[in-house]
Amino acid sequence: MTQSSNVKTFDALFAELSERARTRPAGSGTVAALDGGVHGIGKKILEEAGEVWLAAEHESDDALAEEISQLLYWTQVLMLARGLSLDDVYGKL
């Protein structure tokens, strides 16, 4: 994969979300999700996982990539809510 300045890596996204969790900017959807707790975040993960599956079955590769990116986002929000680091997860790969 070639990288451009507008491409975000998994690690860069986690760093960005961690910073939002730490600084709590007004109007942040990430902060609102974290404040809503693990239950609400988990529901979003289930929703996004279903959308990934449906996109894989019925939509374009671009639509599938979009749905996967949303699932990765919500997975990272859940990691932050539970206090997991990337290393916690990478150690299980």
Curated annotation (Swiss-Prot):
HAMAP family: HisE. This is Phosphoribosyl-ATP pyrophosphatase. GO terms for molecular function: ATP binding; phosphoribosyl-ATP diphosphatase activity. The gene is hisE. Keywords: Amino-acid biosynthesis, ATP-binding, Cytoplasm, Histidine biosynthesis, Hydrolase, Nucleotide-binding. One of its GO terms (biological process) is L-histidine biosynthetic process. Belongs to the PRA-PH family. CDD domains: NTP-PPase_HisE. GO terms for cellular component: cytoplasm. Pfam families: PRA-PH. It is an enzyme of class 3 (hydrolase). NCBIfam families: histidine_hisI (TIGR03188), PRK00400.1-1 (NF001610). It catalyses: 1-(5-phospho-beta-D-ribosyl)-ATP + H2O = 1-(5-phospho-beta-D-ribosyl)-5'-AMP + diphosphate + H(+). It is found in: Cytoplasm. Its EC number is 3.6.1.31. Pathway: Amino-acid biosynthesis; L-histidine biosynthesis; L-histidine from 5-phospho-alpha-D-ribose 1-diphosphate: step 2/9.
